[in-house]
Amino acid sequence: MMTESEFIRASEALFEHIEDQIDENGWDFDCRFAGNVLTIEAGDGAQIIVNRHTPNQELWIAAKSGGYHFAEQNGKWLATRDGRDFYDVLNEALSAASGEAVEIAEL
């Protein structure tokens, strides 16, 4: 398990990476980071929320498709419920919100 400061650094790097990937690829999303929350808004107003839950050292995604909790396991963020990869869930949510294929590369 990471220390709290390691978790915060890792999650901040992940949030920055997501924003950079969206900007570099020109996808139609607006990103806002405030506190522990990265809000990604599609052109039609659909939102995907990515936040960190420091006490549990989890990343959470909230989207129209549902809510997901991810814990770090062997260098990957995997869903606590079904083991799905963070990037797979995020890319599906972003693709559904934008109507185009979105592929955020792993950090």
From Swiss-Prot:
The organism's place on the tree of life at top rank: Bacteria
PROSITE patterns, alphabetized: FRATAXIN_1, FRATAXIN_2
Entry keyword Metal-binding: yes
InterPro entries found in the cross-reference section: CyaY (IPR047584), Frataxin/CyaY (IPR002908), Frataxin/CyaY_sf (IPR036524), Frataxin_CS (IPR020895)
Keywords: Iron, Metal-binding
GO cellular component: cytoplasm
SUPFAM superfamilies per the UniProt record, alphabetical: Frataxin/Nqo15-like
GO BP annotations listed: iron-sulfur cluster assembly
GO molecular function: ferric iron binding
Function: Involved in iron-sulfur (Fe-S) cluster assembly. May act as a regulator of Fe-S biogenesis.
Family: Belongs to the frataxin family.
Protein name, per record: Iron-sulfur cluster assembly protein CyaY
